[in-house]
Each structure stands twice: as structure tokens, then as C-alpha cells.
Swiss-Prot record:
UniProt cofactor(s): Mg(2+); Zn(2+)
Positions contributing to Mg(2+) binding: 71, 73, 75
Entry's cofactor comment: Binds 1 Mg(2+) ion per subunit.
Subunit structure and binding partners: Homodimer.
Residues bound to Zn(2+): 72, 88, 95
Protein name from the UniProt record: Phosphoribosyl-AMP cyclohydrolase
EC numbers, comma separated: 3.5.4.19
Gene3D superfamilies per record: 4.10.80.70, Phosphoribosyl-AMP cyclohydrolase
Main location (coarse class): cytoplasm
Keywords for this protein: Amino-acid biosynthesis, Cytoplasm, Histidine biosynthesis, Hydrolase, Magnesium, Metal-binding, Zinc
Molecular function via GO: magnesium ion binding; phosphoribosyl-AMP cyclohydrolase activity; zinc ion binding
Top-rank lineage group of the source organism: Archaea
A Pfam family assignment: PRA-CH
Length: 121
């Protein structure tokens, strides 16, 4: 299988294995994908910070990998995970917690000000 990286990155959709909720969309480069495969925990590449990161490295809200799938065009990845805590840095279980009209449809799982205090997030 030959993953199609565009500009060195591939989009990664993240889904909770237990209830199939979509948790987030992120990007991985080849190194992040390899770290994910070898460690069993989700790693990504931050486009804004230009660096690798392990999900939960600061918050403790890690994503344990259950399975990694690739789409039919081999240009997108799906991580099926068991999420510890919340996936979104805003404190929501999923990054998809509001409608396009701005209505919040899910409450906070944690207080991000407490979790990321003094960590620069």
C-alpha cells in the first residue's frame, strides 16, 4: 500500500471505536504515521507549529490506536481509537461540537484553562 502524501502530509480522520463518533481531523506526515504504528498511540504533524506531536502529550487525553484504515484513493487515513478524556483542545469530546450556525451541541468534558495552565496552549 502506497499512502499518497500531498506536500508531505495526509489528512487523518479520527473516530472513537466504541460509538463511531468522529472526534477530529488532523494531518500526519510519514514520521507521524510510523510513530503511530509503532507506539500504538496517535501522532500527528502540526501545520501551524511545524512539528510532530503526540495526542495528549500535554493534557493526558491520549488516543490509543485500535486500527488504521486507508481510503480507496490511498490519500486519507482513518484512525479508529479509544479516546482517553476529550479529543478537542477546547474541552469538548469531539472537535465537531457546533453547527455551522454556531450552535453548540455538546458540553465541555474538561476545563481547558485548568488542563493547559502554564503550558502555552
Amino acid at each position: 500500500m502506497e499512502i499518497q502524501f500531498k506536500d508531505g502530509l495526509v489528512p487523518v480522520i479520527v473516530q472513537e471505536r466504541r460509538n463511531r463518533d468522529v472526534l477530529m481531523l488532523a494531518y500526519a506526515n510519514a514520521e507521524a504515521l510510523e510513530l503511530t504504528r509503532t507506539t500504538g498511540y496517535a501522532h500527528y504533524y502540526s501545520r501551524s507549529r511545524q512539528k510532530l506531536w503526540k495526542k495528549g502529550e500535554e493534557s493526558g487525553h491520549v488516543q490509543r490506536i485500535c486500527r488504521i484504515l486507508v481510503d480507496c484513493d490511498e490519500d486519507a487515513i482513518l484512525y479508529e481509537v479509544e479516546q482517553t478524556g476529550a479529543a478537542c483542545h477546547t474541552g469538548h469530546a469531539s472537535c465537531f461540537y457546533r453547527t455551522v450556525e454556531g450552535e453548540e451541541i455538546a458540553g465541555l468534558v474538561f476545563d481547558p484553562e485548568k488542563v493547559y495552565a502554564n503550558k502555552g496552549e
